[in-house]
């Protein structure tokens, strides 16, 4: 499973990139989505690589985001009690493990697929450079560090 965070805005963006960001449901800066690992999403990430940070996510990271930023329709918070009501899982942790394994999806239970994050504490290292150049754009070996800064 990949975690993708939009870091750059829409000004002077090519239409193909804007459309791809829209298909990924990344309409605003600092929004995050989790997508499964397949060639379709990999191609979409390749198109928008200069506008997003992305990396492999695990169940621990998804659990943290669901607890902190998980929302249902009506902007209700996601808690263990709510998870017990809307799904066969007993906790957010079990739900996150099932989603990472591919046994369930957030959409099945009415959980909003987009997570609205804060700007990172202590700031970005730069949104015009890739990770290799000392910035934030592109593939992160540990995307969890960036997401924890943006929690």
Swiss-Prot record:
Keywords assigned: Ribonucleoprotein, Ribosomal protein
InterPro entries, A to Z: Ribo_uL30_ferredoxin-like_sf (IPR036919), Ribosomal_uL30 (IPR039699), Ribosomal_uL30_arc (IPR005997), Ribosomal_uL30_CS (IPR018038), Ribosomal_uL30_euk_arc (IPR035808), Ribosomal_uL30_ferredoxin-like (IPR016082)
Keyword Membrane: no
Cellular component aspect of the GO annotation: cytosolic large ribosomal subunit
PROSITE patterns: RIBOSOMAL_L30
A Pfam family hit: Ribosomal_L30
UniProt GO BP: maturation of LSU-rRNA from tricistronic rRNA transcript (SSU-rRNA, 5.8S rRNA, LSU-rRNA); translation
GO MF entries: RNA binding; structural constituent of ribosome
CDD domains in the cross-refs: Ribosomal_L7_archeal_euk (cd01657)
Subunit structure: Part of the 50S ribosomal subunit.
Family: Belongs to the universal ribosomal protein uL30 family.
HAMAP family xref list: Ribosomal_uL30_A
UniProt protein name: Large ribosomal subunit protein uL30
Organism of this sequence: Methanothrix thermoacetophila (strain DSM 6194 / JCM 14653 / NBRC 101360 / PT) (Methanosaeta thermophila)
Origin organism lineage: Archaea, Methanobacteriati, Methanobacteriota, Stenosarchaea group, Methanomicrobia
Gene: rpl30
């Amino acid at each position: 499973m990949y975690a993708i965070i939009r870091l750059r805005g829409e000004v002077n963006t090519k239409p193909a990139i804007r459309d791809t960001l829209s298909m990924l449901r990344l309409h605003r800066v600092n929004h995050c989505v989790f997508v499964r690992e397949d060639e379709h999403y990999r191609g979409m990430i390749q198109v928008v690589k200069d506008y997003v940070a992305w990396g492999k996510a695990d169940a621990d990271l998804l659990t943290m985001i669901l607890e902190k930023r998980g929302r249902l329709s009506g902007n209700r918070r996601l808690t263990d009690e709510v998870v017990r009501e809307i799904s066969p899982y007993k906790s957010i942790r079990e739900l996150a493990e099932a989603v990472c394994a591919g046994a369930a999806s957030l959409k099945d239970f009415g959980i909003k697929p987009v997570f609205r994050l804060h700007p990172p504490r202590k700031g970005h290292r730069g949104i015009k450079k890739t990770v290799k150049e000392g910035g934030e754009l592109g593939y992160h070996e540990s995307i969890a560090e960036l997401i924890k800064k943006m929690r």
